[in-house]
Amino acid sequence: MPQLELISWFFNFLLAWFFLFIVVTILLKINFPSTNYITVTHPQKLNIFNNWLWT
């Protein structure tokens, strides 16, 4: 059954991307104070987010 093989490959592909996304998100949360990505794009939103975060 080649169709079943394709489905299992697609599932493994999705699982790998999902795992990669989780790892990247965790790394970004660990390195959040040292990254200037959000500061460059949305300074006002970052200030609102920081105020909400520290209250």
UniProtKB/Swiss-Prot annotation:
The record describes its membrane topology as:
Single-pass membrane protein
Annotated coiled-coil segments of the chain:
none
Task: Classify the source by domain of life.
Answer: Eukaryota
Give the residue spans that cross the bilayer. 7-28
- Which keywords accompany this UniProt record? ATP synthesis, CF(0), Hydrogen ion transport, Ion transport, Membrane, Mitochondrion, Transmembrane, Transmembrane helix, Transport
According to its UniProt entry, the function of this protein is described as:
Mitochondrial membrane ATP synthase (F(1)F(0) ATP synthase or Complex V) produces ATP from ADP in the presence of a proton gradient across the membrane which is generated by electron transport complexes of the respiratory chain. F-type ATPases consist of two structural domains, F(1) - containing the extramembraneous catalytic core and F(0) - containing the membrane proton channel, linked together by a central stalk and a peripheral stalk. During catalysis, ATP synthesis in the catalytic domain of F(1) is coupled via a rotary mechanism of the central stalk subunits to proton translocation.
Q: How does it assemble?
A: F-type ATPases have 2 components, CF(1) - the catalytic core - and CF(0) - the membrane proton channel.
For this entry, the protein name equals ATP synthase protein 8
The encoding gene:
MT-ATP8
